[in-house]
């Protein structure tokens, strides 16, 4: 047949007679000699025919015996003869019943628990075929395969004590049946399954001879022709050494060793004594699992002995061409190994390409000899490699395995070849489709070596092949390069390209049109094409094939849509991990404990690796998307920028800094250990249900439905006895204690009946279950499956959210239906239920309030559990005497919200604060009440004769995931401070959390994520599964809008609480201490007091705005939120300038580290900080509190943007929110600008304050929050004392509320001159600010220039008036602005602070008056703003305090819609009721009396938001001068006749204006006073006829 081993088998088994068989005697057809030999029972069922060109599958494929019977042949003969098979026509007849296998791609979600189902010798009934020899020549097979003996005692003291396997590959052995063996590999104890195919050497030839010597001692045993291998027990041997299952010949060396792993490091030198070997019972069926090493079948070996000894040496099985010193040896030098894999490669491949059990999950590895089959059409693909790598992956001693597998040289590393990916059954035909073919030059580039290292391939030589891309595999054919291949060509090599990245290599020094392919195994290859077009076509073809494989795995047809969704998920993951990493780095800077630092560093390292993996996957998917859309590939520079330092070091060691090397390093790192650890920890049930076909989703993964719904007799006819028998051999190793010994009894093999064998798997009894929509379906519950496992499986299959449903069992007891709700971790396999019900949970709102008595407690405890990356809150226990029990709270309920705050956004400190409050609002998801007449079982009936419990479930409800327990039963929780209510449960759980991320890190991240998260992302950082996406889709825009509004309010309340805590915990105590000066306190806290007052006021306006709609929770349409959105947006617009308070705080924040570093040297300061944070939580440190204002001010635009995105683009509120977003962005820009100014000129401002003389400083502070304007002006009259000027100097002019500052700063030329002359000492002392001058507001005047063109020339005159008491002369500054507009702005700012000065004198107060209170907005776009004062820049123009209080009271009554809440004395009570029909415009007009502004169509909204004083004039109209005299006259009348009822509020308000105008005339006449009057008519601030303007 062309295989050296096969010929050697003939030689050893049949004697010298067959030794000289050449290629013509062993063709690729299945030939049988006329000699009568042992009969083999062919496994019934479906037979898999491998074909690389086309791969299809039929659910009703007949087995080989069926095919024979249908074609008039007798399948089996009791006397063991098969005379009819002597004719070559047998091949054609048999081939009619063969169908190829399909593949299912699962590389995206790798799993170790692959359920590879193997056949038991499909063609054992053909004695003279090579399959027969495969079974018969046990010693020959063993001799090459390993020649090792190992003891085995897992299933008895004498069961399979030794094992040696000869590696053999047969042509027609490719004809497998993937499920005839009927056992799932994941159902086996994978701890003891491995192989000894690792290391072979020619020095062990005598072991081979011993093996041959033992061959004739075995006694065959046959099963009847009607039997089949339906479980692993079918393959188990009896204790009688002469008996072999299924008639296979017994061999002393044929025992299957299941605990080889412990002996693998010593395989090379370990040999058992022959005496021990002779007592070994045989287990011959392992011989049907051929070696993963492949051999070329295109050439035979003239010397079989040399062939079998050399071709299998080392991890790399060289082809026979290598041995025969032909063209093949040259190929060995090329670095492209044959169809071989090493241990590490198989481990990695198992991780990268998991497969769960399904009828199409047979995995095939394409090797150099796999193309040889009975028909010789093309490369057949065998499943043997699968079993081998699964055995290696499932071992528990992975370290020993890796050590043994990696003990070879670089030349033996075989990371070149991989298996074709699995595919969906519906897309099987595409597997063999040739996507691209052509002549390529190939060279090995990078090789994944042991210990997850990637190294340059040592044997690198360009080799020319004809390359064909079929599915996700590149097949290499030997060709002259000018012509293609025919259908009989055999691929020499194959490269697995699934999940690969292809990049052009234009920088190759010697060749053109080179591209590099790096796959998910950590290997890379170079290819050279003939042209640039061909290069691009190859890249597109490979990427397109990979994209199709991704879609095939996800069972999606729309590949583009899938890729875009995966890209979006990856971006969310990247964003999440970047925030986590930043928070970890921030925490690292403040942690001093070495253990904590190490934990944080380890976690940061994990995040870095995760980010690299996510970025690589993101780049890969973008490459696939670009290939499908015909676009340009993504820029690799951006990907390489994310490489961490260790990765860069590794790439530097390779000397290759490219996407290919980056991908290889990441794949080598994650493909072997990370995936293995993750997948080995998965439960068996979870791994089995990964890769299913959509047509089988209604069934369990391990069940195969051949025809309609089975009858009860068909499903349950076998009873529990058959189940018990089939489980005895399969589940004996599932128990975690692998050393437990159990007698293996060969069960009776069930007779196969294709007509009634509906469920073909281990005789598991399927269970009916009923979905919430009363739809029945079937599933299989296995031993060890918990209620949680079953619920998750069913919900995932039917796209349900498992957290919103629960599992209920129906029992029929005494003809009465009873129900039972199992615990999540309860094993339901043991329960004798009649039916499973999937029932939806209900959502309830519970409000609990404590009374003043100390005996009242909530009486429940919470557990926070992280499930699939989502943190959930569950009720752990409920006390019967507590308030929670009286309200109906039950243990096991899931808490969705606490006080309108989503549970997944709460950390431990927040939960503690909530539980300490006197009232608690809970939104819980609980079980509904039972229907009437239905009883609930307490102790359901269990199986009596079923198999014993095989171990605890791998999933535990509260122990398998990190979490913490919170108890709300603090005795004095209502009286103690929030920070002091942390209970003992919380502390102990914090220690648990610290082992992974540390409590401080979790708390800091949860809080910062709430502050920094820019979008309403899903709560899970992992990939969103189907049920989660379905749940997210169920949220309407109204629900999302409500959620964002609640988030805005809740985070604002939390922020205000944090600010108060900062003041109470740090600011006030520090003011009483002496270790910090007042200046240092100012640096730390700045204007914190003003910020707290403002935020309290702002929070109140937000709350009042939300209360505009009393039934906010019931709104179902977005347009119903109109009033609320206008109010919220108006709040930000109205207080936009007030937010500039933050500029001072943020500017001084840069100095905070310099002050806090004092704690390192000042023990008293350090002791104070420790005392204020006794639990040493990072979230409670002073630094953490001081950063919150900066985080919050940057959060506002993000929250507004979320509201903006959820509104209708054509609606008025959409525009309104857009303006609010832009305004808050301007505030953020202003804060950033102020911070830059402070960094540059802050020292000058401090020096000017310090240089003031006199007992009382005229200017107390130059705060950045008081800076109204900064600009550059030219000083036209500089004094001669400052030196000569080549041109007029430019001054930086700053207009503060308390002073005007002029500063001249030398340019960079002077600095360069000094540095260039090496006068460093002078440079250090040199002050760049040559001139600085401060003019307090009290001594400031603005004079009009006499020249007519002064305004046109943008010149103004600022005067620092003289002071006789200080002996200061008058000083005049002639300043030229950059433009007339700039001059206008400058003078406007100066006039505003002068007006503020006059107003303070009028009110005889030193402090600025309180700001005008908020009035809610609604209705027409910005109508309510048209009469409003633009806020902060004219905050100094507020009225008196008494007037402000009166207006605040009236405004409060105004925006309270609830009639019960409106005071009976409200002058506008009748206007408080909103219209029932939703006529917002009419209601707003009534509320705000907007009729007087309707005619002002020329007013721009930008004017409303600006600081223009001229806007005030536009509001008053164009006839201000004409109306002024009339208004003053009305004012005098109002003063004489104050008590008259005809006096209206407009005239009385003008009395106030008269006083202001009179005082404003100090610096000018009545004309200038009229310009500076800024009060705007707002009839809505006070009722007519009741406003008293007396001051």
UniProtKB/Swiss-Prot annotation:
GO terms for biological process: activation of GTPase activity; cell migration; cell-matrix adhesion; ephrin receptor signaling pathway; positive regulation of axonogenesis; positive regulation of cell migration; positive regulation of cell population proliferation; positive regulation of epithelial to mesenchymal transition. Changing residue 678 to C: In a colorectal cancer sample; somatic mutation. There is a cross-link at residues 1404, 1420 (Glycyl lysine isopeptide (Lys-Gly) (interchain with G-Cter in ubiquitin)). The keyword Disulfide bond does not apply. Residues 1040-1234 form the DH domain. Component of the Par polarity complex, composed of at least phosphorylated PRKCZ, PARD3 and TIAM1. Interacts with NTRK2; mediates the activation of RAC1 by BDNF. Interacts with MAPK8IP2 and CD44. Interacts with BAIAP2. Interacts with EPHA8; regulates clathrin-mediated endocytosis of EPHA8. Interacts with PARD3. Interacts (via PDZ domain) with CNTNAP4, SDC1 and SDC3 (via C-terminus). Belongs to the TIAM family. Changing residue 23 to C: In NEDLDS; uncertain significance. The keyword Lipoprotein applies. Gene3D superfamilies: 2.30.42.10, 6.10.140.680, Dbl homology (DH) domain, Pleckstrin-homology domain (PH domain)/Phosphotyrosine-binding domain (PTB). Changing residue 382 to R: In NEDLDS; uncertain significance. The modification Phosphotyrosine is found at residues 829, 1323. It comes from Homo sapiens (Human). Keywords: Cell junction, Cell membrane, Epilepsy, Guanine-nucleotide releasing factor, Intellectual disability, Isopeptide bond, Lipid-binding, Lipoprotein, Membrane, Myristate, Phosphoprotein, Repeat, Ubl conjugation. The gene is TIAM1. Found in virtually all analyzed tumor cell lines including B- and T-lymphomas, neuroblastomas, melanomas and carcinomas. Residues 1-78, 298-379, 393-422, 939-1034, 1456-1482 are annotated as: Disordered. Residues 977-990 have a biased composition (Acidic residues). This is Rho guanine nucleotide exchange factor TIAM1. It is a peripheral membrane protein. Its main location: other. Changing residue 1339 to V: In NEDLDS; uncertain significance. Residues 53-67, 367-377, 1014-1024 have a biased composition (Low complexity). Residues 7-19 have a biased composition (Basic and acidic residues). Ubiquitinated. Undergoes 'Lys-48' ubiquitination at Lys-1404 and Lys-1420 by a CUL3(KBTBD6/7) E3 ubiquitin ligase complex composed of CUL3, RBX1, KBTBD6 and KBTBD7. 'Lys-48' ubiquitination at Lys-1404 and Lys-1420 triggers proteasomal degradation. Ubiquitination at Lys-1404 and Lys-1420 by CUL3(KBTBD6/7) also requires the membrane-associated protein GABARAP and may therefore be spatially restricted within the cell. The first PH domain mediates interaction with membranes enriched in phosphoinositides.
């Amino acid at each position: 047949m062309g295989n050296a081993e096969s010929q050697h088998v003939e030689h050893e088994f049949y004697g010298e007679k067959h030794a000289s068989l050449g290629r013509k005697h062993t063709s690729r057809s299945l030939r049988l000699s006329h000699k009568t030999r042992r009969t083999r029972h062919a496994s019934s069922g479906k037979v898999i025919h491998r074909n690389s060109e086309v791969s299809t599958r039929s659910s009703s494929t007949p087995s080989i015996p069926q095919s024979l019977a249908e074609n008039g042949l007798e399948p089996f003969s009791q006397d063991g003869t098969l005379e009819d098979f002597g004719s070559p026509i047998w091949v054609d007849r048999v081939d009619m019943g063969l169908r190829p296998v399909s593949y299912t791609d699962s590389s995206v979600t790798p799993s170790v628990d692959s359920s590879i189902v193997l056949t038991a010798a499909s063609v054992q009934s053909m004695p003279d075929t090579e399959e027969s020899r495969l079974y018969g020549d046990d010693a020959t097979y063993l001799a090459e395969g390993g020649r090792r003996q190992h003891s085995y005692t897992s299933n008895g003291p004498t069961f399979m004590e030794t094992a040696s396997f000869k590696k053999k590959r047969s042509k027609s052995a490719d004809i497998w049946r993937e499920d005839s063996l009927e056992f799932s590999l994941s159902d086996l104890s994978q701890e003891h399954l491995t192989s000894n195919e690792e290391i072979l050497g020619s020095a062990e030839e005598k072991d081979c001879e011993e093996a041959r010597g033992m061959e004739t001692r075995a006694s065959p045993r046959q099963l009847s022709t009607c039997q089949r291998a339906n479980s692993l027990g079918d393959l188990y041997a009896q204790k009688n050494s002469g008996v072999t299952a299924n008639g296979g010949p017994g061999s002393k060396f044929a025992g299957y060793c299941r605990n080889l792993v412990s002996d693998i490091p010593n395989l090379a030198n370990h040999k058992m004594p022959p005496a021990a070997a002779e007592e070994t019972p045989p287990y011959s069926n392992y011989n049907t699992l051929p070696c993963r090493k492949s051999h070329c079948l295109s050439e035979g070996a003239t010397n079989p002995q040399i062939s079998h000894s050399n071709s299998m040496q080392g991890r790399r099985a060289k082809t026979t061409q290598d041995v025969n010193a032909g063209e093949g040896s040259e190929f060995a030098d090329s670095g492209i190994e044959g169809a071989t894999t090493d241990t590490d490669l198989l481990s990695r491949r198992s991780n990268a390409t998991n497969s769960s059990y399904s009828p199409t999950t047979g995995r095939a590895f394409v090797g150099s000899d796999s193309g040889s089959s009975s028909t010789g059409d093309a490369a057949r693909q065998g499943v043997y490699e699968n079993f081998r790598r699964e055995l290696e992956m499932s071992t528990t001693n992975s370290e020993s395995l890796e050590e043994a597998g990696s003990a070879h040289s670089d030349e033996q590393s075989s990371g070149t070849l991989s298996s074709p990916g699995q595919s969906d059954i519906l897309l099987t035909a595409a597997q063999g489709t040739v996507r691209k073919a052509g002549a390529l030059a190939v060279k090995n580039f990078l090789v994944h070596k042991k210990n997850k290292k990637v190294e340059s391939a040592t044997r690198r030589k360009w080799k020319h092949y004809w390359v064909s891309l079929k599915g996700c595999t590149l097949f290499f054919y030997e060709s002259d390069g000018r012509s293609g291949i025919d259908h009989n060509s055999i691929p020499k090599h194959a490269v697995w390209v699934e999940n690969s990245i292809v990049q052009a290599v234009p920088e190759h020094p010697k060749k053109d049109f080179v591209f590099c392919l790096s796959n998910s195994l950590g290997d890379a290859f170079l290819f050279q094409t003939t042209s640039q077009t061909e290069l691009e076509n190859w890249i597109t073809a490979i990427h397109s094939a990979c994209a199709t494989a991704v879609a095939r795995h996800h069972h999606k047809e729309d590949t583009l849509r899938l890729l875009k969704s995966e890209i979006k998920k990856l971006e969310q993951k990247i964003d999440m991990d970047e925030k986590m990493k930043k928070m970890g780095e921030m925490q690292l800077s403040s942690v001093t404990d070495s253990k904590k630092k190490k934990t944080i560093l380890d976690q940061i390292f994990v995040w870095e690796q995760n980010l690299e993996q996510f970025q690589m996957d993101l780049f890969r998917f973008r490459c696939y998307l670009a290939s499908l859309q015909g676009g340009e590939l993504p820029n690799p520079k951006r990907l390489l920028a994310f490489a961490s330092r260790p990765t860069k070091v590794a790439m530097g060691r390779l000397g290759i800094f490219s996407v290919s090397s980056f991908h290889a390093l990441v794949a080598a790192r994650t493909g072997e250990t990370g995936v293995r650890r993750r997948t080995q920890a998965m439960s068996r049930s979870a791994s089995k249900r990964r890769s299913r076909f959509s047509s089988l989703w209604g069934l369990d993964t391990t069940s195969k439905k051949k025809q309609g719904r089975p009858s009860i007799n068909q499903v349950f006819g076998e009873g529990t006895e058959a189940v018990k028998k089939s489980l005895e051999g399969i589940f004996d190793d599932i128990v975690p204690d692998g050393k437990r010994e159990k007698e293996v009894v060969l069960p009776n093999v069930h007779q196969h009946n294709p007509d009634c064998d509906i469920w073909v798997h281990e005789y598991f009894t399927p269970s009916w279950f009923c979905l919430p929509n009363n739809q029945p379906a079937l599933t299989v519950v296995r031993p060890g499956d918990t209620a949680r496992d079953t619920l998750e499986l069913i919900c995932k299959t039917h796209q349900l959210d498992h957290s919103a449903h629960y599992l209920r069992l129906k029992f029929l007891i005494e003809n009465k239906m009873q129900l039972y709700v199992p615990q999540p971790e309860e094993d339901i396999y043991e329960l004798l239920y009649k039916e499973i019900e999937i029932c939806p949970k209900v959502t309830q709102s519970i409000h609990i309030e404590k009374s003043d008595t100390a005996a009242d407690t909530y009486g429940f405890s919470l557990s926070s559990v992280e499930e699939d990356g989502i943190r959930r809150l569950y009720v752990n226990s409920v006390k019967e005497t507590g308030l929670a029990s009286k309200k109906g709270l039950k243990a096991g309920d899931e808490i969705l919200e606490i006080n309108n705050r989503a549970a997944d956004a709460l950390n431990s400190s927040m939960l503690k604060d909530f539980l300490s409050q006197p009232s608690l609002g809970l939104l819980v998801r609980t079980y509904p009440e039972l229907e009437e007449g239905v009883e609930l079982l307490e102790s359901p009936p269990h199986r009596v004769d079923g198999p014993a419990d095989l171990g605890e479930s791998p999933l535990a409800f509260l122990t398998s995931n990190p979490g913490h327990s919170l108890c709300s039963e603090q005795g004095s929780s209502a009286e103690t401070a929030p920070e002091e209510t942390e209970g003992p449960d919380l502390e102990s759980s914090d220690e648990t959390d610290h082992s992974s991320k540390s409590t401080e890190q979790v708390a800091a991240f949860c809080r910062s994520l709430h502050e920094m998260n820019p979008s309403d992302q899903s709560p899970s950082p992992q990939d969103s599964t189907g049920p989660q996406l379905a749940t997210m889709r169920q949220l309407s825009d109204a629900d999302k809008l409500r959620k964002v509004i609640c988030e805005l309010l809740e985070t604002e309340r939390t922020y205000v609480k944090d600010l108060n805590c900062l003041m109470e915990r740090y600011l006030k105590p520090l003011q009483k201490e002496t270790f910090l000066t007042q200046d240092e306190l100012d640096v730390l806290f700045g204007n914190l007091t003003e910020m707290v007052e403002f935020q309290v006021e702002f929070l109140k306006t937000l709350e009042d705005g939300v209360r505009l709609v009393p039934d906010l929770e019931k709104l179902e349409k977005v347009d119903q939120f109109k009033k609320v959105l206008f109010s919220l947006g108006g709040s930000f617009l109205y207080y936009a300038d007030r937010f500039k308070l933050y500029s001072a705080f943020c500017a001084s924040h840069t100095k905070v580290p310099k002050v806090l570093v004092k704690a390192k040297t000042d023990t008293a300061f350090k002791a104070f900080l420790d005392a204020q944070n006794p639990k040493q939580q990072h979230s409670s440190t002073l630094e953490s509190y001081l950063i919150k204002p900066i985080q919050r001010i940057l959060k506002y635009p993000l929250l507004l943007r979320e509201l903006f995105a959820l509104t209708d683009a054509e609606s008025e509120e959409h525009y309104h929110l857009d303006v609010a977003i832009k305004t808050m962005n301007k505030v953020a820009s202003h804060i950033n600008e102020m911070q830059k100014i402070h960094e540059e000129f802050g020292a000058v401002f401090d020096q000017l304050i310090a240089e003031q003389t006199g007992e009382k400083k005229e200017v107390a502070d130059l705060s950045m929050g008081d800076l109204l304007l900064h600009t550059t002006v030219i000083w036209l009259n500089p004094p001669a004392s400052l030196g000569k000027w080549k041109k007029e100097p430019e001054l930086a002019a700053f207009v503060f509320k308390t002073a005007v500052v002029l500063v001249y700063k030398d340019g960079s030329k002077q600095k360069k001159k000094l540095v260039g002359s090496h006068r460093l000492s002078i440079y250090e002392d040199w002050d760049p600010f040559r001139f600085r001058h401060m003019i307090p507001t009290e001594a400031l005047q603005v004079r009009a220039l006499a020249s007519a063109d002064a305004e046109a020339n943008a010149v103004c005159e600022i005067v620092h008036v003289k002071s006789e008491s200080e002996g200061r002369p008058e000083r005049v500054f002639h300043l030229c602005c950059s433009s007339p507009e700039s001059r206008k702005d400058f003078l406007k700012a100066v006039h505003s602070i002068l007006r503020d000065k006059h107003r303070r004198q009028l009110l005889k107060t030193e402090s600025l008056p309180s700001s005008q209170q908020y009035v809610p907005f609604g209705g027409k776009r910005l109508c309510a703003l048209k009469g409003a004062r633009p806020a902060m820049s004219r905050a100094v123009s507020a009225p008196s305090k008494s007037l402000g209080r009166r207006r605040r009271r009236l405004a409060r009554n105004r925006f309270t819609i609830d009639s019960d809440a409106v005071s009976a004395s409200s002058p506008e009570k009748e206007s408080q009721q909103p219209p029932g029909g939703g006529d917002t415009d009419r209601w707003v007009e009534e509320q705000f009396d907007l009729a007087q502004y309707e005619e002002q169509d020329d007013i721009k909204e930008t004017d409303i938001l600006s600081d223009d004083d001229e806007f005030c004039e536009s509001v008053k109209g164009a006839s201000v001068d004409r109306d002024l005299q009339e208004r003053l006259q009305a004012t005098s009348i109002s003063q004489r006749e104050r008590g008259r009822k005809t006096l209206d509020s407009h005239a009385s308000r003008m009395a106030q204006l008269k006083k202001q105008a009179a005082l404003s005339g100090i610096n000018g006449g009545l004309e200038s006073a009229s310009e500076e009057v800024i009060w705007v008519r707002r009839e809505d601030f006070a009722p007519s006829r009741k406003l008293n303007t007396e001051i």
